[in-house]
Curated annotation (Swiss-Prot):
Keyword Zinc: yes
Claim: Zinc is one of the keywords in the record: yes
Domain of life: Bacteria
Location in or out of the cell: Cytoplasm
GO MF annotation: an example: cysteine-tRNA ligase activity
Cofactor note: Binds 1 zinc ion per subunit.
GO biological process: cysteinyl-tRNA aminoacylation
Catalytically driven reaction(s): tRNA(Cys) + L-cysteine + ATP = L-cysteinyl-tRNA(Cys) + AMP + diphosphate
Protein name: Cysteine--tRNA ligase
Binding-site list for Zn(2+): C30, C213, H238, E242
Motif placement: 'HIGH' region: 32-42
Its EC number(s): 6.1.1.16
């Protein structure tokens, strides 16, 4: 089990990971609020934590992965009322859609996916504890607020100072009469007409968003656990508020390491509905194979901002297809033959990249070099070396959740045909024409066919077993 470093958002630097329990990692990631289809920003968070977990497990870590579902929220209530359906009908429909999208992207299911509505009692217990400790207070209207000035370390995750924030609060925060401080946040909301509610010591109502994650994470993983993650947009106020209410309630450190995934921009601008550049995963899958979306996400470091565009996805499509063609070229000669012997130099370089804050950009550079070596070994008919390189590449792409489809099925899909410009059947037909030309000693025609295919990105390689083809690197 190789030591690894990760960027801890709270410390604002890369640090070596030290588990609370030897060989075990407990991880909680903020999931979706299920009132609509998941967008490409959600896709990045899902895929990033998926390949992080896949890698850690490949290294021998026993990872317990919790990703919650927010199934009660202002947006959910509003959308259900607009649609004329119950909240449960709405949320179950979009939970199913979310799980389907995640599966299409090749993401492993979390070990547990707690729903907020299943933990109302635990949320009320935490709120009651905060009130009893003087860290929270009930307002006259039935709301309960967390008092931020009672938590001295408030702002330590985001690097914000409460005094600085308060100075401009009148411009940024709706100062409610019931609040003692403009940044006090709601733990329990009093019941309103036509909204779901639960009985509580403070009257009927429902939980605030922030308390949901604190209750679910600590119930599933304990008061103090290893890693908490989510999108960068959640750092403040959501994760900041989680720390405050959790530590004020338990008296223990909440989380050891915070991981935040960077933003996705669309054609250089921040993704937003108002700009009309907001795309759901399903929108994008109408044009691109889901594994191309995954490749696009994997190819950049998880903390870096990424520009989403058709051009970027087409580049991802071309690059991913090269791996499939290398696999096809190998399988045409050696079938599915693999070996447990791996090229340790490539494995070590790949692991070193991933152990440096899960640097997939560097890891992919290693895989491209390995892919080129595999193509060379197949071309030179070095059977033993080709088998080792193929087995190594398959092992490492599996860790990243790439090249997971049947080679022929993938290359016959729209993505494969677009990348090649020629279908498999068309290429095989050209190869047969070339074989016939060589038999007829029409070498000029044979050379012409080879050159024509090369210009269309198809490389022919003559071996003892016959002619095989692949996409040019």
């Amino acid at each position: 089990m190789q030591p690894f470093v990760l960027y801890n958002s709270e410390q604002r630097k890369k640090v070596e990971f030290v588990p609370r329990k030897e060989g075990h990692i407990d991880m909680y990631v903020c999931g979706m609020t299920v009132y609509d289809y998941c967008h490409i920003g959600h896709a990045r968070v899902m895929v990033a934590f998926d390949y992080i977990i896949r890698f850690l497990r490949s290294q021998g870590w026993k990872v317990r992965y919790i990703r919650n579902i927010t199934d009660i929220d202002d947006k959910i209530i509003k959308r259900a009322n607009e649609n004329g359906e119950t909240i449960q009908q709405l949320t179950m429909r979009f939970i199913d859609a979310m799980n389907e999208d995640a599966a299409n992207l090749g993401c492993l299911a979390p070990d547990e996916a707690p729903k907020a509505t299943e933990y109302i009692d635990q949320m009320q217990n935490m709120i009651g504890n905060l009130v009893n400790k003087g860290a929270a207070y009930p307002a006259s209207n039935g709301d309960v607020y967390f008092e931020v000035t009672k938590f001295e370390k408030y702002g330590r995750l985001s690097g914000r100072k409460l005094d600085d924030m308060q100075a401009g609060a009148s411009e940024r925060v709706d100062v409610e009469v019931e609040k003692k401080h403009p940044f006090d946040f709601v733990l329990w909301k009093h019941a309103k007409e036509n909204e779901p509610s639960w009985a509580s010591p403070w009257g009927n109502g429902r939980p605030g968003w922030h308390i949901e994650c604190s209750a679910m994470s600590t119930c599933c993983l304990g008061n103090h656990f290893d890693i908490h993650g989510g999108g960068s947009d959640l750092m403040f106020p959501h994760h900041e508020n989680e720390i405050a209410q959790s530590e004020a309630s338990t008296g223990e450190q909440y989380v050891n390491y915070w991981i935040h995934v960077g933003f996705i921009n669309v054609d250089g601008e921040k993704m937003s509905k108002s700009l009309g550049n907001f795309f759901t995963i399903r929108d994008v899958m109408e044009k691109f194979h889901p594994e191309v979306i995954r490749y696009f996400i994997v190819s950049s470091h998880y903390r870096s901002p990424v520009n989403f565009s058709d051009v970027a996805l087409k580049e991802a499509k071309t690059s991913l297809t090269r791996f499939y063609h290398s696999f096809k070229a190998y399988q045409q000669v050696y079938g599915q033959t693999t070996t447990e012997t791996l090229d340790q130099s490539f494995v070590e370089r790949f692991n070193n990249a991933m152990c440096d804050d899960f640097n997939t950009a560097e890891a992919m550079a290693v895989l491209f070099e390995l892919n080129k070596e595999l193509n060379r070994a197949v071309k030179e008919e070095q059977a033993d070396q080709a088998t080792v390189l193929y087995s190594t590449l398959r092992h490492l792409t599996n860790i990243l959740g790439l090249v997971q489809h049947n080679v022929d099925d993938f290359l016959k899909s729209d993505i494969g045909q677009e990348a090649l410009a020629l279908s498999d059947a068309e290429i095989e037909d050209f190869i047969q024409q070339r074989v016939d030309a060589k038999k007829a000693k029409d070498f000029a025609k044979a050379d012409s066919i080879r050159q024509s295919l090369l210009e269309q990105g198809v490389v022919l390689e003559d071996t003892r077993q016959g002619t095989v083809w692949r996409r040019a690197d």
